Amino acid sequence: MGRVYFRWFSIAVVMFAQLAWARFARAADTAEAELRQSVQELERWLGNDVQAPGWRKFLKTDQLNAELGKGARADRGLVREVLDRFASNAPGLERRRFVAVRSALKKWLDTLPAWRAEQLPEMARAAKPHLVLVTESDVKRERARLDAAVDKLRQLLSEAKQEQAASWKEAVKWAQLESELAAAGAQPDLKTLLAIEELYRQDIAGLEQDEFVAVRQALDKYVCTALFASSAEPKKVYEGFLDELAERFPSYAQNPQAEDAIFIGKRLGWLDRFGQARELVAAARSSHSRPNLFLEVSEALMQAGIDQNVDETAAVNEVILGTRIRGNARLTGAVTLDLVPSQDNAAINILLDGSTVSNSVGYNGPVRVFSRGVTSVNAVKRLQLDDTGLSDRRATARCSTRTRIGRVEAGHLVRHIATKRIQKTKPQAEAIASRRAAGRIAGNVDDRSADLVQDANASFSDKFRLPLVRRGGFPQLLQFRTTDDALQVTMLQAGRDQLAAPNAPPALTGKFDLAVRMHESLVGNMSQAVLGGVTLTDVRLVEMIKELTGKPPEGLGDDPWSITFQSELPIEARFTARTAKITIRGKRFTREDQEIRRPVEISAVYTIEKLPDRARLVRQGDVQIDFPGRQKLSTTDIAMKSFMKKKFEVLFKPEIVSEGLTLPKRWASIGKLKLELLVCDKGWLALGWLKPPAPAATETLVASSR
């Protein structure tokens, strides 16, 4: 029997593979056919126009047709070069037929076989003859884009309130930028523009607006283009970097090391910054820069903070079929959370199931009708979470009302007529009551969830999204998904000069209520986006630690001091076999009126132990304070080093013990989550927690007397 099952399983796998390949092949054929058609339409449109030869030469249409003839064996690098021409900012390329080719070209490139990691060295060497020279016209084009972006920002500033506009102008040195750009016939000082561009990355409210971001990006592009155009030996530097990458790729693929990741990331960043070897850059990042954070939260844990019983009383006062109804209604039921499988975003249903019991009196002329109604209530509120925040749909509700008529008060004859009329109109009245109840319930759910959605979005935007957008460090990938029983988050954090994770995370061995898998690259990359170049005072550090732990650290803020972080890798983590090394890098340190302006590194190494009831980190040796590049220290250096060691030993304690994880606010009542998984190796730190068992249900005794 086992052989039969195995045979059918094998057949199913083969059939699935064939169907998947057939689907991919059809997609490739469709993309190629679409590209051929759009190229033919472009050729017919160009025809014998006087500018047609220039367009064909610039867009490399002959090379494109040659690669189309190769089908799936087309050279991705050459196709990428053609795509770059169609995607450039050359005037006229916004016309419909050029746009059609560009769109089809992108689709076709996506269907071509991707480069493998072992092909990267060969690819780097093959890119050496393809240096893209930057001309003066390229510099002028980027300057025009910068001027246009500045004009739009100028308009925004003119429309803003005077006090706010003045604050923004001062923060980004607006007057200095205008002065640099106003110099007629002279190129602005590129170092000055580069310094101004950094100011647009400050965490100041408002700098996330499109107009500020556009100026920041245009400044970066213009400065990079102008620098490359004025470079004395761009070919030598370009070929040297490609040779270095070809040498480093194999060792990094076999045994990824953080030093190699930093080296490769910087070289790829240089190529990307100056628009060189785009296909190599894309292929290298695809192979060696993968998501570096995976988060999973179980439905059961989410329900522990959301699910609740409902017991509410409200007055009834409405008119149904001409009868004024007054009384009270009591809603009892339960609010529960239900995850909906979704690959595009996190889909969450908030469900309300219960019933409403009402006791009311209906008034219609001389008649009074006493009744009791029971309404079943089922309401659904859909929430969706993606990289822009939390959104919601209007709640829907289904209600069904059944009434039981009690006594009818009126004169004898009138009561008889009223009773017959009540029985006749009862189904219609119940239908009206059901519809109105559904509308009220849905409206109440929407009203109550409005503050929840608004607060969640404010927290997400103010504490995460907007600060990173302002500093140009929002994750390249932030994906939310839901399954039947878990919410999953996948994130890739890497800047232009950085790599993320080189490999997949360790597998989760079991089911957890909360699981985090973090690559060491996340610490360095995220810290650069958040803390690069930032000055942190002792007061602010104490506040941050208090926010995280609930209590202030002792001895950290006794004497006034501050540290200004390095712009690159201000904090770095290394995760090896049950060992974690944390390094803090600064470029300026102050103590009261004393100051040193030189690189300093503060580091500590911990061994990590998973014990049955807790996790323990034990520091190996002392906290290390180093001044890179300095062999001899001055008296001031020695005194400052001693002071720093004293302060950071408070932060890097000899032993750190965690007996569980306490969640905030609504989840605090469930108790501490117990750490069940701890893996620290090969650059990854994996943690998994389980919530404590729910307390045993207590029996409710009902007493009655006779």
What is the predicted role of each segment?
Residues 374-376, 380-389, 394, 421-424, ...:
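Amphipathic, rod-like alpha-helical scaffolds used for oligomerization/assembly
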Residues 29-305, 417-620, 627-706:
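Extended, low-charge, aliphatic-rich alpha-helical segments
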Residues 22-28:
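Boundary at the C-terminal end of the N-terminal hydrophobic targeting segment
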Residues 335-390, 561, 569-605:
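N-terminal beta-strand/beta-hairpin edge segment
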Residues 2-10:
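Bacterial N-terminal signal peptides that target proteins for export
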Residues 278-344, 361, 677:
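Interfacial loop/beta elements and low-complexity acidic/Ser/Thr-rich segments
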